[in-house]
Amino acid sequence: MVSTPELKKYMDKKILLNINGSRKVAGILRGYDIFLNVVLDDAMEINGEDPANNHQLGLQTVIRGNSIISLEALDAI
């Protein structure tokens, strides 16, 4: 039996995802499922230290769970 990830404390908070290909995506967590697929609002791909290199992904973005390496809270929990 598959259990649901415990991400309730991250809901409606800004998070940073490290995903495959050494990419980073930041956004507000709006939803998730048992496979760790996540829905982010105002998602942005982070490219290095310079904010000018960041790329807006859209108002709502779905990231597949199998591509997520780690998740980090950017807002206080």
Swiss-Prot record:
It comes from the Eukaryota. This is Small nuclear ribonucleoprotein G. Component of the Sm core complex, present in spliceosomal snRNP U1, U2, U4/U6 and U5. The core complex contains SMB1, SMD1, SMD2, SMD3, SME1, SMX3 and SMX2 (Sm proteins B, D1, D2, D3, E, F and G, respectively), and is probably a heptameric ring structure. SMX2 specifically interacts with SME1. InterPro entries: Lsm7/SmG-like (IPR044641), LSM_dom_sf (IPR010920), Sm (IPR047575), Sm_dom_euk/arc (IPR001163), Sm_G (IPR034098). Keywords: Cytoplasm, mRNA processing, mRNA splicing, Nucleus, Ribonucleoprotein, RNA-binding, Spliceosome. GO terms for biological process: 7-methylguanosine cap hypermethylation; mRNA 5'-splice site recognition; mRNA splicing, via spliceosome; spliceosomal complex assembly; spliceosomal snRNP assembly; U2-type prespliceosome assembly. Plays a role in pre-mRNA splicing as a core component of the spliceosomal U1, U2, U4 and U5 small nuclear ribonucleoproteins (snRNPs), the building blocks of the spliceosome. Residues 2-77 form the Sm domain. The keyword Plastid does not apply. GO terms for molecular function: RNA binding. It is found in: Nucleus; Cytoplasm. Present with 1400 molecules/cell in log phase SD medium. Belongs to the snRNP Sm proteins family. GO terms for cellular component: catalytic step 2 spliceosome; commitment complex; cytoplasm; nucleus; precatalytic spliceosome; SMN-Sm protein complex; spliceosomal complex; spliceosomal tri-snRNP complex.
